């Protein structure tokens, strides 16, 4: 049995094998920016309403330049260019009587008995379709947001109708839907108790259809995630709607207990239901397992909790790429993954064998009997047959479709494994959006992944060896919400190069790129491997594909600056920093690379020595994330220390520090000279000029960074010790502020 067959019928893969991943360290981003840094330097914008939560529904309208937001008791229209300005909001609360009924049913009137807007769709050129929970009375409405001439306008709901089967009752439940023409396809819970799970079609001219109720073979406690309309051919009669969800696996062995799996389901858009059986039910519904796992010798490690799916369109509308984020359901370890699927692989699974179980005590197997014609799951059209309607399907086709909705073979990810993994990072992936970017050496897919701690990860998919295998590289980690609220929805505008992120507490907007934060040197810009950015000869700026590509330096595939930046002379001269220490004391040599993925190496050149030797960790030497700590200083520690960042095999000097180790007597002379000096007016102190005379008679004007730590002699008074400790602390703090700088500033 191959891996595909083993993954399909689960008993052998119900266990989560973590032998190969349990000790895996989380991937570090090259650049990490806090909310404060984004706010101060990179233009993060936020929107929130007073006493309102749960911004779950986002809709981008590129034509009108608006972002529509659905939240608790409100629908808002924001500018795509700046969500903080020109916001228009309309209240849509649940009626008082509905809230009272909700409260009488045992729900909390303050947190549950509200109208939580879950669904927003563009209905036509002037109206939106919005649906909300309505205090456990699902309701939908058409909202006018533009005039016939295109002018932006906003009024209240013009047409109200029952939202049952369109949006959930309970605000804790997710809604997944797509509007195709005037038809709404939804995956929801259709009852107050949250037990009637259904895939439902409403609105439009075709009859309303749903899945078979209370049949675990069709749906078994599903959690709906996303819905897409994807054409199958040039004939619109072949169009299908694809549902992505997770559910309890009916095919799991009883001994394994309850097990969650991810699914992709399909229905035909022109399905009209059956004539004698499956009346007002789907006759073309099929589902297959969606696998995202890491192969291993002892078994596969499964990421079985589907969280979100993004459809990245291509030139051929029939073959988009599907990017999906998953998490684990195991308590053994915490992990998330991104898997990529092709529509050809999805269709291949639905054309494969059906899953079959003869009886309650039998195992699930591949169906070996005769499959009726037309094949269940095929749409009635002239492309694949002569049937013009599902009502014309023979009874044996309808009966087979009712009893065999599950496919035997799963859908495996491209490359056979996840594109990107994050294990033990302290967060879970919740949302994903993608953008296809033209770079100097090809086109690249850039992923934006939302987490449950309010961060967005920027990941690029690059070829790994021979195509089509790819790997994901983590470029950035951005804290877009100050309160670390979980990200619940994301929308992307490739046209405006903006990302819109929603959480329970607010909506945020960030640009897709921050080229100036990548560095001030050609090598830094090239090592970043950001397809949005390139070195223009003087700065890291936005890359625009033009005919003059030779003037822009960019290498996304390899990230190798050795050739591209060989002629770059900017910032090639390191400023020399002087650091002072006292025998038997300590000295801290600060050097923190901009990239968290860089490895720092230290070399030392003693006085009178021609060669640099590598500084190794020992009892007196401690490496830290921010630099090198030297303890028990000796006179022979004086010399030149060079800090070099190594990344992707490329070495880049960061800092050159000259350490002078002084005797206790020299340090004492300095202290007494300072105490005898008259108080200086406010401003920079120049006492170090006298101090440098002890080290460099006749010089010392070039010292722009000083730090001294010395032991306290035992014969000094306590008061003198206190004064010196305070003086040293002031000296350390002032130098730290001068030298550290922000993470987005260069160190030389």
From Swiss-Prot:
UniProt xrefs under Pfam families: ig (PF00047), Sema (PF01403)
Protein keywords: Developmental protein, Differentiation, Disulfide bond, Glycoprotein, Immunoglobulin domain, Neurogenesis, Secreted, Signal
Cellular component, GO annotation: extracellular region
Disulfide bond annotation, renumbered to this chain: 102-113, 131-140, 268-379, 292-339, 515-533, 643-709
Domain Ig-like C2-type: 561-659
Positions of glycan attachment: 82, 124
UniProt similarity note: Belongs to the semaphorin family.
The protein, known as: Semaphorin-3B
Upper taxonomic lineage: Eukaryota, Metazoa, Chordata, Craniata, Vertebrata
Gene name linked to the record: Sema3b
């Amino acid at each position: 049995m191959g891996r595909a067959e083993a993954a399909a019928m689960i008993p052998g893969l119900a266990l989560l094998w973590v032998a190969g991943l349990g000790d895996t360290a989380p991937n570090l981003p090259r650049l990490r920016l806090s909310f404060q840094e984004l706010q101060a330097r990179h233009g993060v914008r936020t929107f929130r309403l007073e006493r309102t939560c749960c911004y779950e529904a986002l809709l981008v309208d590129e034509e009108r330049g608006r972002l529509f937001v659905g939240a608790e008791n409100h629908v808002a229209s924001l500018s795509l260019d700046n969500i903080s300005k020109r916001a228009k909001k309309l209240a849509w609360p649940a009626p008082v009587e509905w809230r009272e009924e909700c409260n009488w049913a045992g729900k909390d009137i303050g947190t549950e008995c509200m109208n939580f807007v879950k669904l927003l769709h563009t209905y036509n050129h002037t109206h939106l379709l919005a649906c909300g929970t309505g205090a456990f009375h699902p309701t939908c409405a058409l909202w006018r947001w533009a005039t016939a001439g295109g002018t932006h306008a906003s009024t209240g709901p013009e047409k109200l109708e029952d939202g049952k089967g369109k949006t959930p009752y309970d605000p804790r439940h997710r809604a997944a839907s797509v509007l195709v023409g005037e038809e709404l396809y939804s995956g929801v819970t259709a009852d107050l108790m949250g037990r009637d799970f259904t895939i439902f079609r409403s609105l439009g001219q075709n009859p309303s259809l749903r899945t078979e109720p209370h049949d675990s073979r069709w749906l078994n406690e599903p959690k709906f995630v996303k819905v897409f309309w994807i054409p199958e051919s040039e004939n619109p009669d072949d169009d299908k709607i694809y549902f992505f969800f997770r559910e309890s696996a009916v095919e799991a062995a009883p001994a394994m207990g309850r097990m969650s799996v991810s699914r992709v389901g399909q229905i035909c858009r022109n399905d009209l239901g059956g004539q004698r059986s499956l009346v007002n039910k789907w006759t073309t519904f099929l589902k297959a397992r969606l696998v995202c796992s890491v192969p291993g010798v002892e078994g596969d490690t499964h990421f079985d909790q589907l969280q979100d799916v993004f459809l990245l369109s291509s030139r051929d509308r029939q073959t988009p790429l599907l990017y999906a984020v998953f998490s684990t359901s195991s308590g053994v370890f915490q992990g998330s993954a991104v898997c990529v699927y092709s529509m050809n692989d999805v269709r291949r699974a639905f054309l494969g064998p059906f899953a079959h179980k003869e009886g309650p005590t039998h195992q699930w197997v591949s169906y070996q009997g005769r499959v009726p014609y037309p094949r269940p799951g095929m749409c009635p059209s002239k492309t694949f047959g002569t049937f013009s309607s599902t009502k014309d399907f023979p009874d044996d086709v309808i009966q087979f479709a009712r009893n065999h909705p599950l496919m035997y073979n799963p859908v495996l990810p491209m490359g056979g494994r996840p594109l990107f993994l994050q294990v033990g990072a302290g967060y879970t992936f919740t949302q994903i959006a993608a953008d296809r970017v033209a770079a100097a050496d090809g086109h690249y897919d850039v992923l934006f992944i939302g987490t449950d701690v309010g961060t967005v990860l920027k990941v690029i998919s690059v070829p790994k060896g021979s195509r089509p295998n790819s790997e994901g590289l983590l470029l950035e980690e951005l804290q877009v919400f100050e309160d670390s609220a979980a990200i619940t929805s994301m929308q992307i505008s490739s046209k405006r190069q903006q990302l819109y992120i929603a959480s329970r507490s607010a909506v945020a907007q960030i640009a897709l790129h921050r080229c100036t934060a990548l560095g001030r040197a050609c090598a830094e810009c090239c090592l970043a491997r950001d397809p949005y950015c390139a070195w223009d000869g003087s700065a890291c700026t936005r890359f625009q594909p033009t005919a003059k590509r030779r003037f822009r330096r960019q290498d996304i595939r390899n990230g190798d600056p050795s050739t591209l930046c060989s002629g770059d002379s900017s910032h090639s001269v390191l400023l020399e920093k002087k650091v002072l220490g006292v025998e038997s004391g300590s000295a801290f040599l600060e050097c923190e690379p901009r990239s968290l993925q860089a490895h720092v190496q230290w070399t030392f050149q003693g006085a009178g020595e021609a060669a640099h030797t590598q500084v190794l960790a020992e009892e007196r030497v401690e490496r830290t994330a921010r630099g090198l700590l030297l303890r028990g200083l000796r006179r022979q520690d004086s010399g030149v220390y060079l800090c070099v960042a190594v990344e992707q095999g490329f070495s880049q000097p960061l800092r050159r520090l000259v350490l002078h180790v002084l005797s206790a007597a020299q340090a004492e002379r300095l202290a007494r000279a300072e105490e005898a000096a008259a108080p200086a007016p406010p401003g920079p102190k120049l006492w170090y000029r006298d101090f440098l005379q002890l080290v460099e008679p006749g010089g010392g004007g070039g010292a722009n960074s000083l730090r001294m730590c010395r032991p306290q002699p035992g014969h000094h008074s306590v008061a003198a010790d206190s004064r010196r400790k305070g003086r040293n602390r002031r000296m350390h703090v002032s130098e730290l502020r001068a030298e550290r700088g922000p993470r987005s500033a260069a160190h030389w």
